[in-house]
């Protein structure tokens, strides 16, 4: 099985996680209730604004959704908010979207939330598999000389890869996308990478 073959590799990858944390800044509140992250960028003021946005989102969602099985990944880039995770109902999804849109500074909400009946169930095997895929992609981004890895977030849930960040040019975008698409064990890639030139328009 996948897990038997890769568990030793996963352990090795986890040993590298402290190094790879420089790629993505992730903070959690509670026991995995909500994960939030902001992509690191050289523009200090933009980072401050994004940090404020995801902090406000985090606080609002913790206040509204106090059940510990809720697990969302919220990423913010230039006011664009990417929501990733499994939730229990359409009602919860609408509440989450309403809360996020109500935060000052949010200019776009990218909804990658999935309704999953057993979203409160923690599947340890799937978690280890997703973690292995995530770390393997991140390590390749770090080692790719033509990729500015600090500009990308990689999130994997249920074998689906979610990419978020800023590509300096088309070649870098294609290389990042290719690394994710060729990762072993994935079923899909959701690409939400911005082109640097588009930000200047």
Which sequence ranges carry the predicted segments?
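N-terminal targeting leaders
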Residues: 2-8, 14, 20-201
